[in-house]
Amino acid sequence: MTALILKRVAQAIPVMLIVAILTFLLMKLLPGDPAILIAGDGASPETVERIRVELGLDQPTVVQLGQWLWNLFHFDLGRSFLLSQPVSQAIAERLPVTISLALLAFAITIPVGIIMGVVAAYLRDSWFDTGVMSLALLGVSVPSFWLAILAVILFSVTLGWFPSAGYVPFLDSPLGWLRSLILPASILALFQIGYLARMTRSEMLEVMDQDYIRTARSKGVSEYSVLSTHAFRNALVSVLTVSGYIFSLLIGGSVVIEQIFALPGLGRLLVQAILARDLPVVQGTMLFLGFLFVAINVLVDILYTIADPRVRYD
């Protein structure tokens, strides 16, 4: 098992290297000169050129890439033009907000989505099944920002149940933390609940059509045991794989949600950096999110091999 884990981690290293190179090259394609941004309006050409030399922007792209990868190897993501602090520090300060939002949304998505999918499979072609499929369609057709704005107007402005913006750290007030995140987390989860329910329903229906399920029913096994012990247990392996993909989507979806609810997380940091053309922050945040997605996929892959030992021999 240890060898398998090491193999999966080793396979992720070149992927991370490719992510790093693509992130660097993408930033080079963006308009604007960081030296002019740092120098400010009205700076002389000599000042701008001096800053370009200090930043190494006068070097060929290949040299800049090599230097950036070397700094990255030493956990140096550069320094923010806008915040006047190391990019790694800016990310570390805002990471707990994004992780809290994604984990809370994940905690809502998984049980609700799985239960809805199982019930929809059991009540196939019923009104509940139709409702679940409609929710899945809603998740891919309705923009998240539109639904988030409606939720703020209804639950925050009109009813006053939840705060419309802001974040309370968990250590300061667990209840305040929950109140500040429950609404954005619910909106974020809503789009994934339908997807997970549809996936669970599909896997359950496929398993329930197998011969061993018919055999169990013919032997008089209760329907509850058939669903929980036989059908769901076998369908859960595929659902586990999807859960990692869902968590990655929740991290990515937090960019819009954090902006609407004024949550000081990585998503809002990225948007502010893009608007201010703070390239080191944009570069560092995108790279960190890319590495995070790769790490999540590796973790899910390892859990998948634990849940289904047959994969180890493929």
Curated annotation (Swiss-Prot):
GO function term, MF aspect, one: dipeptide transmembrane transporter activity
Its membrane topology: Multi-pass membrane protein
Keywords: Cell inner membrane, Cell membrane, Membrane, Transmembrane, Transmembrane helix, Transport
The keyword Cytoplasm appears for this protein: no
Annotated ABC transmembrane type-1 domain residues: 95-304
Subcellular location: Cell inner membrane
Main location as per UniProt: membrane
Keyword Ligase on entry: no
Residues that span the membrane, as ranges: 12-32, 101-121, 135-155, 177-197, 237-257, 286-306
Stored Pfam families: BPD_transp_1, BPD_transp_1_N
GO CC annotations, alphabetized: plasma membrane
Function as written in the Swiss-Prot or TrEMBL entry: Probably part of an ABC transporter complex that could be involved in peptide import. Probably responsible for the translocation of the substrate across the membrane.
Family listed: Belongs to the binding-protein-dependent transport system permease family.
Assembly information from the UniProt record: The complex is composed of two ATP-binding proteins (BAB2_1052 and BAB2_1053), two transmembrane proteins (BAB2_1050 and BAB2_1051) and a solute-binding protein (BAB2_1049).
PANTHER family assigned: DIPEPTIDE TRANSPORT SYSTEM PERMEASE PROTEIN DPPB-RELATED
Name the UniProt record assigns to this protein: Putative peptide transport system permease protein BAB2_1050
